[in-house]
């Protein structure tokens, strides 16, 4: 309660609230990243691979990438192809994607969440650049875009650089 009431906007919003003891919870250190996304006979998908943030979650983007890429690995293995190069690329690209999502969208974002005008501007810019550089890729490039984690490969890299300039 004391934590929430330190912020002037939260204090105003909750001025008439009836508090229930023990009903306020928070967690620290939610983000995590698996050190290995795929290996010999396994691939992690969705939140099993990594989690960044509940507010601006890239979860659905990562689900589409990890499941599609895992399926491609399985199909290649069933055809008798060597999958080690694809596994190595998948691990490296996903690690770069995770780091770049953090740098582009999350780093220092919570520092100005209580500042409406600044947060609104950042949110609008984030959404616009997200749709131009991330969400549009499968529509522009087809299924090949689902096999590339966002912000880790050339088509979405410029959007990563633009987003991290103002966050």
For the regions a language model picked out, list residue spans one by one.
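A general structural signal for short secondary-structure boundary/capping elements
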Residues: 21-29, 89, 136-141, 152
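Residues that form generic nucleotide/phosphate-binding pockets
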Residues: 2-6, 13, 89, 93, ...
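A conserved FAD-binding loop/helix module that cradles the flavin
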Residues: 52-71
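Conserved active-site and cofactor/substrate-binding residues in soluble primary-metabolism enzymes
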Residues: 43, 62-65, 85
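FAD-binding beta-loop-beta segment adjacent to the flavin cofactor pocket
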Residues: 24-50, 54
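Conserved FAD/dinucleotide-binding core of flavoprotein oxidoreductases
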Residues: 1-22, 26, 50, 58-61, ...
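C-terminal auxiliary extensions adjacent to catalytic cores
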Residues: 112-167
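Active-site-proximal substrate-binding core of FAD-dependent oxidoreductases
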Residues: 69-123, 134-135
